[in-house]
């Protein structure tokens, strides 16, 4: 209950004081996944290190790409999926894109609670249904 209040307050604050709209979220993701972004470069190094370890120890790796569920009808973040697919394939991961399992659904169907885009039980079930055939 306390975490729901914190999330609700965080959402209310950001809706009032941040740049509004989907475009600000797209801009944020473009900045995060820019080739020269320090966090992006660190992520690539860590994914490669994990891949090298897995290869040395004969471990299969999977990268499941979870979509941003704010707008699954007119999805604006395909560039993130493309980037992560390229990295995964280059490093030897099996890539599983979860967007097709969720695309076209209204976000409210998948939100853990109003305004919180973390997946609810249905979202988790859709992801599991998409991942299971790949890993079995």
Regions found by a protein language model. Give the residues of each.
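Serine-dependent acyl-ester chemistry module
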Residues: 1-86, 90-93, 98-104, 108-109
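Histidine-centered active-site loop/cap adjacent to the catalytic His
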Residues: 114-136
